[in-house]
């Protein structure tokens, strides 16, 4: 399947399911089952309920999608600084 045949839509994660799967409500109100892309799993990008995401849907099956981007929350404060390992 070529990349040109995929639909890119925005949505909000409603529920986190086992095995890195999610239930996402799209902007048009449709609910789809989605999974995290390999690149997101590789870089350990955490997706939580309430996150805005961008997903790709196949034109052949509009009930399943692949999450390929998690939008950063502008109003979230920067995280607590972690203790870095200091070489002595």
Curated annotation (Swiss-Prot):
Domain S1-like: 1-72
Pfam families noted in UniProt: eIF-1a
Keyword entries, A-Z: Cytoplasm, Initiation factor, Protein biosynthesis, RNA-binding, rRNA-binding
A GO cellular component entry from the record: cytosol
Tagged with keyword tRNA processing: no
Entry's localization field: Cytoplasm
Disulfide bridge partners, by residue number: none
GO MF annotations, alphabetized: ribosome binding; rRNA binding; translation initiation factor activity
Similarity-based family: Belongs to the IF-1 family.
Subunit-level organization: Component of the 30S ribosomal translation pre-initiation complex which assembles on the 30S ribosome in the order IF-2 and IF-3, IF-1 and N-formylmethionyl-tRNA(fMet); mRNA recruitment can occur at any time during PIC assembly.
Role this protein plays: One of the essential components for the initiation of protein synthesis. Stabilizes the binding of IF-2 and IF-3 on the 30S subunit to which N-formylmethionyl-tRNA(fMet) subsequently binds. Helps modulate mRNA selection, yielding the 30S pre-initiation complex (PIC). Upon addition of the 50S ribosomal subunit IF-1, IF-2 and IF-3 are released leaving the mature 70S translation initiation complex.
Name of the protein in question: Translation initiation factor IF-1 3
Species per Swiss-Prot/TrEMBL record: Burkholderia orbicola (strain AU 1054)
